Amino acid sequence: MQDSWNAYLKSLSPALRELRLGAPEVMKSFSGLAQGSLAAGALDTKTKELIALAISVATRCDDCIGFHAKAALEKGATREEIFETLGTAIYLGAGPAVMYAAHAIEAFDQLAQPAAA
């Protein structure tokens, strides 16, 4: 588990910046894929972020958990919606998903707190 999901996400920025500089076409394409897949359509963006969070838990991607917990929060997801999402991830991912679901609720709760001054 992370002591601070806000700090953890900020720590990824330099490495991601290097990746964008080193592989600009790949990262531009990846960004386009992300934007296209998360755009509102039959499903709204919040629902898509909740799906992405569930997949992040099931695939055990800490970085993805942080990014999608934050995005779900920014799109208005409630703690109750997060728990329902995590329940689905646990159902699909069994035991390991339980451990990563704990990461996801921890990330959501930390990211929902106002930044320390």
Task: Name what the model sees in each region.
Residues 61-64:
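Short cysteine clusters
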Residues 1-47, 99-117:
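Acidic, glycine/proline-rich low-complexity segments that act as flexible tails and inter-domain linkers
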Residues 67-79:
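Iron-sulfur (Fe-S) cluster-binding segments and ferredoxin-like electron-carrier domains
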Residues 83-109:
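C-terminal structural segments of small proteins and small subunits
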Residues 76-86, 113-117:
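Charge-rich, acidic-biased intrinsically disordered regions
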Residues 42-59, 80-85:
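Immediate flanking context of iron-sulfur cluster ligation sites
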